[in-house]
Amino acid sequence: MGLKLSGRYIFLVLAVHLAYLLQAVKAAGKCDAVFKGLSDCMLTLGDKVANYPQDLEEKKNLDTICSYWDDFHVCTVTALADCQEGASDIWEKLKRQSKNLNIQGSLFELCPGSTGAPGPRLLFPAFLPLLIVFLSALLNWVLQ
């Protein structure tokens, strides 16, 4: 019997954390639009995961998840494009730190991106929303 968290619960936690992060950024008065853009990226990723088709074969399953992950990264780069206050550097630092955590089954491992490195073909892990919450928490920690 493993821990089962519903998507709604996880995204509620994410929303609360994002609200806190956005409030902290607004108080600092820096790059408000960037954090709205990042939160929109996370919400879009969450919507895609919530509407994820569960009956796909394994390869198509992973390809679908990786396309969501790629879209998320494109969205974040776009959101960061207008901020001149080091947000891009913070995002790259956050991605490097997240990759270095070496969490088995993480999206960095499952979706190696354009490097051409072969990644394991596993079924969609249920921890994707938890990874999103973790990335949000890590971003908050880096910005403090």
Swiss-Prot record:
Keywords: Cell membrane, Glycoprotein, GPI-anchor, Lipoprotein, Membrane, Signal. InterPro entries: Neuritin_fam (IPR026144). Pfam families: NRN1. The keyword Transmembrane helix does not apply. It comes from the Eukaryota. It is found in: Cell membrane. Residues 115-144 form a propeptide. It is a lipid-anchor; GPI-anchor. Its main location: membrane. One of its GO terms (biological process) is neuron projection extension. One of its GO terms (cellular component) is plasma membrane. Residues 1-27 form the signal peptide. A lipid is attached at S114 (GPI-anchor amidated serine). Modulates postsynaptic dendritic arbor elaboration and synaptic maturation. Belongs to the neuritin family. This is Neuritin-B. It comes from Xenopus laevis (African clawed frog). The gene is nrn1-b.
